[in-house]
């Protein structure tokens, strides 16, 4: 159980949670299949295991792992448009009259309702870790929309959820640009070989570099010309590597082999034990990594009144 992406949210108040109350709350918002006329459903599922008895909350030390599933019927717009055009053409030809917007919209709704039961279903899951002792919720996603879907559903389940995206005092682009310009990152962080450079003008250019020496003259010339680093690949303390963007999204997380081998050793031969060990080790690593990252980026910004 290793997260591949990371969006970090700060709890703005103490969250009094225990496994039983969280399990009960999530049960009120459990995932279910789409009914024949439903476009989408969203709810919580067991992060580990299957079946109705699998718990919706996995607890390890003082960390809670949860998972949400979105189920949606895929109805391509082109299919609806083609069916609507065919119906409109048929009415206009048979009844010798024009079909106007109000009737056209009604026909479209009828077509959607007819096609929905036969539409393909797509399912996707999003994992999150709640760490009350750290005051954080960590979502395994690079999409703010997916993270907000999970958090808003969790808020509905709990009744309230005092949380906000974590922010830092210094603009991330300024720090990342400085690291590439000076060829040195702060603390135990090391610049790797990938970055994205953007012009400061609204319609300015974008340069994406992969497997490239970021200390090269070419990169430095872009920085001298005023481009800013908006995405940068980094390594931390020989434990993990990742790509950080200007919104503080951590992408393409990769945990080093030593950590994964340790989790395999701790988990034993049982599949659930392996998942639990990897989740625990991941969260203990995050407990060190995230404070170090935000300190290196200038320190966490605490909004006034919070």
Swiss-Prot record:
The compartments listed are: Cytoplasm, Nucleoid
Q: What InterPro entries does the entry give? A: RdgC
Gene Ontology cellular component list = bacterial nucleoid; cytoplasm
The region annotated as signal peptide is none
Which keywords annotate this record? Cytoplasm, DNA recombination
Q: Does the keyword tRNA processing apply?
A: no
Please, which domain of life does this record's source organism belong to? Bacteria
State whether keyword Cytoplasm applies: yes
Q: Pfam families annotated for this entry?
A: RdgC
Q: Name one GO biological process term.
A: DNA recombination
Primary location group = cytoplasm
Q: Extract one GO molecular function annotation from the record.
A: double-stranded DNA binding
Q: What does this protein do?
A: May be involved in recombination.
The family assignment reads: Belongs to the RdgC family.
What the entry lists under PANTHER family is as follows:
RECOMBINATION-ASSOCIATED PROTEIN RDGC
The molecule here is called Recombination-associated protein RdgC
